[in-house]
Amino acid sequence: TKLLLAIDLGASGGKMFAGRLGGDVFRMEEIHRFEHEAASFFLPDSSGAVRERSCWDDTAIYREILRGLRLFRRHVGDRLDALGVDTWGADAQWVDADGEALGKVYCYRDHRLDNMVEEVRARISADRLYRLTGIHFQPFNLSNQVLWFATRRPRLLAAAAKLLPMPTLFNYYLGGCTQVDSTWASVTQMMDARRRVWSRPILAALGIPRRVLPVIVPPGSRVGLLQPALAQSLGLNRAVIVAVASHDTASAFAAAPADDPRDALIISSGTWSLVGRLIPRPVTSAAAMAANISNEGGIGNTRFLKNCMGAWIVQELLRVWEAADGRRMSWEEVDRLTPAAPPF
């Protein structure tokens, strides 16, 4: 029996599942769940102007991952064969040649990205960008984020040795791994959708050196082992770290309970709702571009989908109501009250 651990990180919370694979039977149980959210910082820039910045607390998320690993040790055992991390499909951390973080991890909802789509399009035509990547145009695409750093923080970019996407960042904390799988790389709007490599024309247009980007590997690749000292501190063996389908929607689509996923309409709903289907290869026609449909990497296929609003509106309402009266409403309470609420 193989003992596995899945670390599923969304934009508002995380879940960790212990899995047992033996013969033709796979069993899974949730062992840890936690909430997290971006924090607002009010930071002065080089001009002295104070600007609000929205950043992730990657240290807090990492601490919760360690808590989940300790719970695995307590409830499952001291043997762990493999683990994998998936995350939301935006944001990354810069590290220097010594492995030190260069600043905070910006959140994709930070307003510095509001006009970046237009800046990217000014450097490479929208038609060409879509033909190469098949990715829709959204402010949070990593292409917009790296252009912002290249144009607004050139000294940081000059000091950077590597850009670590969110799943890679936590694999790096756990085992020093710096690879990214193709499902996550696809949503950056910098990967060639057909060749599954970083697109040189796009990198040249954005002014991003290829050396700072991680190596792209197929989902399911073994990329490292738990650091020895970390494994010892957790009472575990040096488990294999796998670059899974690390864009959370890619993993969700792969696990969709459909008789034939190729003929199914799949909806993956969380903070965002992703609606689409699996197709053999990208469709980058003018009609697909006009509909703002994405061709995101899958496991041997392409996720042809539309990005829709999910539970984020409800999450924000819960946050505002808690700030107003100091009481945190549970999701169970939301479920109970929703049917009785008057329609708009």
Q: Model-flagged regions — what are they?
A:
Residues 48-53, 72-108, 133-142, 171-192, ...:
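Short beta-strand-loop/turn "lid" adjacent to the catalytic site in phosphate-handling enzymes
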Residues 1-103, 131, 231-241:
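N-terminal glycine/serine-rich phosphate-binding loop of ATP-dependent small-molecule kinases
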Residues 93, 115-119, 252-254:
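Pocket-flanking alpha-helical
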Residues 109-119, 139-141, 191-200, 219-228:
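A structural motif shared across PLP-dependent enzymes of the aminotransferase-like
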Residues 65-81, 152-157, 200-210:
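Phosphate/pyrophosphate-binding loops at sites that engage ATP/ADP/AMP, CoA/4′-phosphopantetheine
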Residues 5-7, 18-20, 121-133, 144-179, ...:
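Active-site core segments that coordinate phosphate-bearing ligands/cofactors
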Residues 13, 218-226, 246, 273:
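Glycine-rich phosphate-binding loops at beta-strand->alpha-helix junctions
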Residues 33-34, 39, 106-113, 185, ...:
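Short, acidic/turn-prone active-site loops that include or flank metal/cofactor-
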